[in-house]
């Protein structure tokens, strides 16, 4: 049985989180679709928050 791919919105959130940890700005969001962009920005915000709390360096 094949594994299912993760949904696109979940992947957008994860990519945004990784971008935030990597120090990218929110203007570097690669998504044009409003839902995917919203998820990416949510992940980016979570990562910035985690970095500010000292969870990541």
Swiss-Prot record:
The coiled-coil segments of this chain are none
Q: Where are the transmembrane segments?
A: none
Signal peptide position in this chain?
Answer: none
- Record InterPro entries: Ribosome_modulation_factor, RMF_sf
Provide one Gene Ontology cellular component.
cytoplasm
Record has Cytoplasm as a keyword = yes
One of the GO BP terms on file = regulation of translation
Query: Organism's domain of life?
Result: Bacteria
Q: Where in the cell is it found?
A: Cytoplasm
Chief location of this protein within or outside the cell:
cytoplasm
* Alphabetic keyword roster: Cytoplasm, Translation regulation
The keyword Cytoplasm is annotated on this UniProt entry: yes
Q: Where is this region: Disordered?
A: 1-24
Question: What is an example of a Pfam family matching this protein?
Answer: RMF
Q: Which HAMAP family match?
A: RMF (MF_00919)
What is this protein's function? During stationary phase, converts 70S ribosomes to an inactive dimeric form (100S ribosomes).
Q: Which family does it belong to?
A: Belongs to the ribosome modulation factor family.
What protein is this chain from?
Ribosome modulation factor 2
Q: Which organism is it from?
A: Colwellia psychrerythraea (strain 34H / ATCC BAA-681)
